[in-house]
Amino acid sequence: MRYYCLMDIKVKIGLRIKELRTDKNLTQEEVAWKADVDRTFMNHVENGKRNASVDTLTKIICNGLDSNFKDFFSAELFNGKRRSK
């Protein structure tokens, strides 16, 4: 059961990264460059296929997406609340 929870969170993190990236009209390559991570790795994280360390997530969220953990994890995706538009 715990394995499925881990899979679920990887997918949710990837979906949120993609959501923020597309909202900001950025490509995976642009985010990867700003975050100093490999574009292929970035693609795998975004698609829920790879785990990213906290350090790497920090680089992607803060540097690559110019966001922060509070905003990143406050999305409806993680807490079931709807975002106001």
Please tell me what each predicted stretch does.
Residues 1-23:
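A short, Lys/Arg-rich alpha-helix, primarily the initiator
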Residues 1-6, 70-85:
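Short, charged recognition helix plus adjacent turn
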Residues 15-34, 59:
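Short basic helix-loop element that most often maps to the first helix and adjoining turn
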Residues 49, 64, 76-80:
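The DNA-recognition helices of helix-turn-helix-type DNA-binding domains
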Residues 36-51:
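Recognition helix of helix-turn-helix/homeodomain-like DNA-binding domains
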Residues 17, 31-32, 42-45, 72:
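Conserved hydrophobic/aromatic packing and binding residues within compact polymer-binding modules
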Residues 55-71:
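DNA major-groove recognition helix of helix-turn-helix/homeodomain DNA-binding modules
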